[in-house]
Amino acid sequence: MRADQILPDDVNHGQFDGLTIRKGTVAAFLANARTWTRADADERAQAQSQIAEDLPALRALGLFEVLEIRDERLRALVEGL
């Protein structure tokens, strides 16, 4: 399956498991995960807040059913939220 079969180029949101999810949510999670694992306290807090906000969408997409977070601290954070 191609990305445009999930969300065409002209569509920015989709319904998945009853949630409206914005295109780019997975990419934003990856960016925030990188920041969280490498950042100072202020950046880390901002990244953690965004990760927590996006978790329902990521779970609705089934992201963690097929991928496992390798960083133990980040995995514990996500599992605890």
Question: What do the PLM-derived regions correspond to, one by one?
Answer:
Residues 23-46, 56:
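Short, surface-exposed, low-complexity cationic segments
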Residues 55-81:
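Short, compact, well-ordered microdomains
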Residues 1-13:
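Short acidic, Pro/Gly- and aromatic-enriched capping/linker segments at domain boundaries
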